[in-house]
Amino acid sequence: MELLCGEVEPVRRAVPDANLLHDDRVLQNLLTIEERYLPQCSYFKCVQKDIQPYMRRMVATWMLEVCEEQKCEEEVFPLAINYLDRFLAGVPTPKTHLQLLGAVCMFLASKLKETIPLTAEKLCIYTDNSIKPQELLEWELVVLGKLKWNLAAVTPHDFIEHILRKLPQPSEKLSLIRKHAQTFIALCATDFKFAMYPPSMIATGSVGAAICGLQQDEDVSSLTGDALVDLLAKITNTDVDCLKACQEQIEVVLLNSLQQYRQDQGDGSKSEDELDQASTPTDVRDIDL
């Protein structure tokens, strides 16, 4: 007789507030304040002497894998990357402290967005115990001070529902478009070239790339090509040419990620367990442009 209780209490989430989603003032306020939370410079050129772009990409990929394995809310990873970039834009940091900084940023973002946030002990385990919980807690205060406790940053996820609501999409397709757009946002967060893009542009480009990638199904959208881009640009007051360029860059990043995944899959030296680990954002392998 099995006495072990296997019940798992579901995570409690607030339902979407229609009053907020249908009030254009909310979207306008997001557009007004979003640039306050961007890094102030391309910090590899003028601030960081020890950290290189590939190091940032490695720690961002590690952070994404941790968030996926812990089934964090979609907003946690981009928000943590926002903290990381803003800190690095102002504070010269040794490369030996980069993973510690990434862990602290996830720690803070999960406190803001998760019902049950990540613990310091769990994050230390993900670093193979190369950092101690007390060290993480001490650095938490350092990061908070440098960010001036300004943690409620605007991220691309804040725009997704506002954009989807204004598109002439079949309701049954919205969840798939949303899922793909969230994947693109995660991909953008791992690539520094998007670090200084406004969140609204990343969100708009991600939605556009998601719809274009799903247009193999004729019923996905009543808008295509330039008409779709024009509508998306109008929703978020984005320059059309800038939006097209952003969407093209997102698609290139996706293709590079897919190619890397296929190379890893074909590498006979990798074990099946290694291949099963999340090395690309959720469902990237299921997306076809």
Curated annotation (Swiss-Prot):
Keyword entries, A-Z:
Cell cycle, Cell division, Cyclin, Cytoplasm, Membrane, Nucleus, Phosphoprotein, Ubl conjugation
What is its subcellular localisation? Nucleus; Cytoplasm; Nucleus membrane
Which of the residues bear the PTM Phosphoserine? 271
Keyword Ubl conjugation included in the entry's annotation? yes
GO BP: any one term: G1/S transition of mitotic cell cycle
GO MF terms here are: cyclin-dependent protein serine/threonine kinase regulator activity
Residues carrying Phosphothreonine: 280
The reply to whether Zinc-finger figures as a keyword in the UniProt entry is no
Query: What GO cellular component term, any one, is given?
Result: nucleus
InterPro entries, sorted: Cyclin, Cyclin-like_dom, Cyclin-like_sf, Cyclin_C-dom, Cyclin_N, Cyclins_cyclin-box
Q: What's a Pfam family this protein contains? A: Cyclin_N
Into which family does the record put it?
A: Belongs to the cyclin family. Cyclin D subfamily.
Q: What does this protein do?
A: Regulatory component of the cyclin D2-CDK4 (DC) complex that phosphorylates and inhibits members of the retinoblastoma (RB) protein family including RB1 and regulates the cell-cycle during G(1)/S transition. Phosphorylation of RB1 allows dissociation of the transcription factor E2F from the RB/E2F complex and the subsequent transcription of E2F target genes which are responsible for the progression through the G(1) phase. Hypophosphorylates RB1 in early G(1) phase. Cyclin D-CDK4 complexes are major integrators of various mitogenenic and antimitogenic signals.
Oligomer and partners: Interacts with either CDK4 or CDK6 protein kinase to form a serine/threonine kinase holoenzyme complex. The cyclin subunit imparts substrate specificity to the complex.
Q: What is this protein called?
A: G1/S-specific cyclin-D2
